[in-house]
Amino acid sequence: MTRGFGPFGKIQEALKKAQEVRDGAQRLQKELEEMEIVGEAGNGLVKVTVNGNQEPLKVSLDPQVLQESVDVVEDLLLTAMVNAYTQSAETMRKRMEELTGNISLPGLGLG
């Protein structure tokens, strides 16, 4: 008997579940890289696209926004960036919860 894990069968079960989480995390990483999440500002005049890892992919500006002052354009860009980042981070958090939410690792006091 290994201290903290109980009988050998529980160790095998814990290792199997850990492998499932690892495999799921690898799939999730690929999904996050392929996602496109759009943050907007100014009723869609400014759009920033990031992937599920919060990496910037694209910025789109409606030509109408270029008639505004530099300060306004900067504020709109920042707002769209924060919006995209927030959505991406929340998506990542939810997906990680889905991945690990039902996993119980016996003997570790988790789940």
UniProtKB/Swiss-Prot annotation:
Keywords assigned by UniProt, alphabetized: Cytoplasm, DNA-binding
UniProt subcellular location: Cytoplasm, Nucleoid
Major place of residence: cytoplasm
Pfam families: YbaB_DNA_bd (PF02575)
SUPFAM superfamilies: YbaB-like (SSF82607)
Transmembrane segments: none
Alphabetized GO MF terms: DNA binding
The keyword DNA-binding appears for this protein: yes
Gene3D superfamilies: Nucleoid-associated protein YbaB-like domain
Gene Ontology annotations for the cellular component aspect, listed alphabetically: bacterial nucleoid; cytosol
Function according to Swiss-Prot or TrEMBL: Binds to DNA and alters its conformation. May be involved in regulation of gene expression, nucleoid organization and DNA protection.
Quaternary organization: Homodimer.
Family, similarity comment: Belongs to the YbaB/EbfC family.
UniProt protein name: Nucleoid-associated protein CYB_2894
UniProt source species: Synechococcus sp. (strain JA-2-3B'a(2-13)) (Cyanobacteria bacterium Yellowstone B-Prime)
